[in-house]
Amino acid sequence: MAKEPVRVLVTGAAGQIGYALVPMIARGIMLGADQPVILHMLDIPPAAEALNGVKMELIDAAFPLLKGVVATTDAVEGCTGVNVAVMVGGFPRKEGMERKDVMSKNVSIYKSQAAALEKHAAPNCKVLVVANPANTNALILKEFAPSIPEKNISCLTRLDHNRALGQISERLSVPVSDVKNVIIWGNHSSSQYPDVNHAKVQTSSGEKPVRELVKDDAWLDGEFISTVQQRGAAIIKARKLSSALSAASSACDHIRDWVLGTPEGTFVSMGVYSDGSYSVPSGLIYSFPVTCRNGDWSIVQGLPIDEVSRKKMDLTAEELKEEKDLAYSCLS
C-alpha cells in the first residue's frame, strides 16, 4: 500500500536555504524514500516571482515522491493541512541594525505565523524553526500557538551538532558516520556549548571516548569549541553568503530523526522546551541531547556534568533569558 502524502511547509522558500531544502524534501531525504510529499512553499509578496520559479523547477525535476506543490504568499493557504512546518523565513540582521530592531521584526513575523499554523495546520503538526534567533523565534511561536503541543515545537541546533561531528571526524581522520553523541547545549548562537564529554567514536576495537582518541584537551576545550561556535561566520566570510546547503541538510536530519527515530545508542541535539532537566530554567527553548522514537523526543537524562560544562551551560541559558526578555519587550 502506498503511503498517504505528508504535507510539508517551508517558509522563506524562495531564499537560499529554501532553494537547497525543497529538493532534499522532494527526494525523500527528510521523510524517507517511500514517503510521498506535497510541498507547501510560503514567502513574502516581493519574492512571489522567484517562488514561482522554484515551483517551475520542482515540476521540471519530476521527483517521483512529489505529489503536489503549493507556492503562495498567503499564510493561510501555506499553512492549511500541513503535517510538518520548517520555518526558514525570518528577518536577517543587517549592518547597523540594533538587536532590538531585528528582534521586533522577527517577533511580529512569528506571532502572525503562529496564528496561521494554529488555525490551519493539521493536528499534531511538527514545527522546526530555522530562522534566527531560532530559539527565541520558536518560543514566540509557542506562545502564540497555544493549541500546538509544546513538544511539537523545536528549533534547529542540529547544524551545530553536525558541525561538531565534522570537526572531530576531520581531527581524527575517521568517517563522520563513526562519530556520535556530541551535544550542543543552549542557544543557536556563539554562546552555545559544544560538549564532547559523552561523545564516542567507532573503532576496530569497539567504541572509544572522543577525549581518549583526540588526546588533546587543550584543543577540545578551546579551538574545537570556538570553531563550532563561529562556523557560521567563517562560511559567510568564505562564501559571502550564509550556510544554506548544510542548514538544509541538518533540517532534514532533525525532522527525519524526530519522525523516524534515532538509532539505538545514539543521541542528537534539538532545541526544545525546557522542563528543568540539567537545572536549565523552564520556559526557555534550549538545546539538549535527545533520543526520538514513535515521533516523540525525550531528553537524555543522567549524564554527568562537570563544573566547566555547568558554567558554559548556565552562560548560554543566561543569553536565552535576555533574548526572551527582549522579545517580550517588543510585544508590549
UniProtKB/Swiss-Prot annotation:
Name of the protein described by the UniProt record: Malate dehydrogenase 1, cytoplasmic
Tissue: Expressed in rosette leaves.
Active-site feature positions: H188 (proton acceptor)
A Pfam family of this chain: Ldh_1_C
PANTHER family to which the protein is assigned, alphabetical: MALATE DEHYDROGENASE
InterPro entries assigned: L-lactate/malate_DH, Lactate/malate_DH_C, Lactate/malate_DH_N, Lactate_DH/Glyco_Ohase_4_C, Malate_DH_AS, Malate_DH_NAD-dep_euk, Malate_DH_type2, NAD(P)-bd_dom_sf
MF annotations from Gene Ontology: L-malate dehydrogenase (NAD+) activity; mRNA binding
Origin superkingdom: Eukaryota
Positions of NAD(+) binding: Q16, I17, D43, G90, Q113, N132
CC terms in the record's Gene Ontology section: apoplast; chloroplast; chloroplast stroma; cytosol; extracellular region; nucleus; plant-type vacuole; plasma membrane
Subunit (UniProt): Forms a homodimer. Forms a disulfide-linked homodimer upon oxidation. Interacts with 14-3-3-like proteins GRF1 GRF3 and GRF8. Interacts with TRX1, TRX2, TRX3, TRX4 and TRX5.
Record function comment: Catalyzes a reversible NAD-dependent dehydrogenase reaction involved in central metabolism and redox homeostasis between organellar compartments.
Principal EC category: oxidoreductase
Regulation: Decreased activity upon treatment with hydrogen peroxide.
Positions annotated to bind oxaloacetate: R99, N132, R163, H188, S243
